[in-house]
Amino acid sequence: MSQLVYFSSSSENTQRFIERLGLPAVRIPLNERERIQVDEPYILIVPSYGGGGTAGAVPRQVIRFLNDEHNRALLRGVIASGNRNFGEAYGRAGDVIARKCGVPWLYRFELMGTQSDIENVRKGVTEFWQRQPQNA
């Protein structure tokens, strides 16, 4: 199975979700000066920022990570977290990334996610990779 790449702000909600998920994952650094590069296809798990619009929905660190053509080329899908208080903007970062990068939006969960979210994502990620061609 290929990897997960995620970003978690200082609130650590996404980090806690990843820990509970128990799947191999690489974190995009919080410090904007630090860079990572991936070498295999991955699913991105990203929190949504802002209060409603598309501007500012995707964290700057994630934008910088995806602006690296090598990293962007290996992206296969996106999962977003958010807050239902933002209504239609709930999980908007996932929508923005899926549209701009031409990958499927796979799942959306609130804040740290529920046990049901953990189970759904674990199962969904496994099934997603099983459906992918070997060299995708």
UniProtKB/Swiss-Prot annotation:
GO MF annotation list: FMN binding
Domain of life of the source: Bacteria
Gene3D superfamilies according to UniProt: 3.40.50.360
SUPFAM superfamilies membership: Flavoproteins (SSF52218)
Protein induction: Induced 2-fold by hydroxyurea.
Pfam families documented for this protein: Flavodoxin_NdrI
GO biological process assignments: protein modification process
Family (UniProt): Belongs to the NrdI family.
Function field: Probably involved in ribonucleotide reductase function.
The protein's name in its UniProt record: Protein NrdI
Organism in which the protein naturally occurs: Escherichia coli (strain K12)
Gene name linked to the record: nrdI
